[in-house]
């Protein structure tokens, strides 16, 4: 919980200290909703980290697994290349990237002022991914150390 609060504080500093003043970013949506969805994304990525840590045998392997997990997740998120411009097989892979759903929700909230009535599918998908990966990580952790 403490690390989640640190990440949320860093997000707030970046949002209000950098993006707002430097780029004159118009924040149109609910900041409470944005931070709740950010906390859900942190939960999902913590699950990925826990799962990677239980698969690896040492810290060096965790570092390598992090690159192997994060690079495709970033490339398939839609941040650099729109999902619509990707081939069909890459679009399917983008569905398993929690970053794709987080960016969809964050853009919707901050730039468009969208509410949960239009973002529920992205939030639900990210939540399901979070429960799956965190559950898998906890299961592996329990078998290894329990």
Where are the regions a protein language model picked out?
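A cross-family signal for key residues in well-ordered alpha-helices
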Residues: 66, 94, 142
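Conserved catalytic core of Hanks-type protein kinase domains
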Residues: 68, 75, 96
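Alpha-helical transmembrane segments and their short interhelical loops
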Residues: 1-67, 71, 116-123, 127, ...
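Short cytosolic juxtamembrane segments of multi-pass membrane proteins
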Residues: 139-146
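Membrane-interfacial helix-loop-helix junctions in multi-pass membrane proteins
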Residues: 26, 78-132
